Amino acid sequence: MTLTIVISLLSAFFLLASSIKLTGWQRKIFETQLAMFESYGLNRQAMFSVGLVELFGAVGIWFQGSGLGPLGAAALLATSVGAIFCHLTFDSWKDGIPAMITAALSAFVLWHGWSSINSVFT
């Protein structure tokens, strides 16, 4: 039950975040995020790539019975760690709090996925 709730929250968050990065449908948030990416020395293409990784992870984490689940969780963990690094390097630690939360939740899902995969092979 807990895993389903965490996956639902992560998936909803990253589906929203990736849709904005990929399509720019929410103009104000898109422009704010693009300005942050540019302040980190990254361009629109990098932002689009992050959006693709987030979309893959948000969908992949639902497939916990296969290797796709842990791979999706690892993708979300990687983007969260990258966001934490950028916020700690260029902003304040407070700006990185959402990424710290998503990193912890992604690590939980990844841990659960790996333990279910290991039980198949042992």
Positions of the model-derived regions?
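Membrane-interface extramembranous regions
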Residues: 1-122
